[in-house]
Amino acid sequence: MALDLSDVKRIAHLARIETSDDEAAQTLAQLNNFFSLVEQMQAVDTTGIEPQAHPLSAVRDMVQRLREDVVTETDRRADYQRPAPATENGLYLVPKVIE
């Protein structure tokens, strides 16, 4: 996948980023280099390779020290919502700003 200058300018416009022609050209080169790298990685045949959740254990004989998945803090939602001007069902109510 390769972008052209009009793609970069359109993306910048959608993101509300003002760019000069030189900046757009530099960004185009960087994005196309990135997409080229992604295409190279996707072209690698990974058939039969098991995904690694902890890649360090494949390189070294080490055990990952993972903490227990337990709650360590109390629920303070009510405390945080008490000073709010308006809440409902645990959510903050705010004025509508977009129609």
Curated annotation (Swiss-Prot):
Keywords: ATP-binding, Ligase, Nucleotide-binding, Protein biosynthesis. Its EC number is 6.3.5.-. It catalyses: L-glutamyl-tRNA(Gln) + L-glutamine + ATP + H2O = L-glutaminyl-tRNA(Gln) + L-glutamate + ADP + phosphate + H(+); L-aspartyl-tRNA(Asn) + L-glutamine + ATP + H2O = L-asparaginyl-tRNA(Asn) + L-glutamate + ADP + phosphate + 2 H(+). InterPro entries: Asp/Glu-ADT_sf_sub_c, GatC. It is an enzyme of class 6 (ligase). One of its GO terms (biological process) is translation. GO terms for molecular function: asparaginyl-tRNA synthase (glutamine-hydrolyzing) activity; ATP binding; glutaminyl-tRNA synthase (glutamine-hydrolyzing) activity. Allows the formation of correctly charged Asn-tRNA(Asn) or Gln-tRNA(Gln) through the transamidation of misacylated Asp-tRNA(Asn) or Glu-tRNA(Gln) in organisms which lack either or both of asparaginyl-tRNA or glutaminyl-tRNA synthetases. The reaction takes place in the presence of glutamine and ATP through an activated phospho-Asp-tRNA(Asn) or phospho-Glu-tRNA(Gln). Belongs to the GatC family. Heterotrimer of A, B and C subunits. This is Aspartyl/glutamyl-tRNA(Asn/Gln) amidotransferase subunit C. It comes from Cupriavidus taiwanensis (strain DSM 17343 / BCRC 17206 / CCUG 44338 / CIP 107171 / LMG 19424 / R1). The gene is gatC.
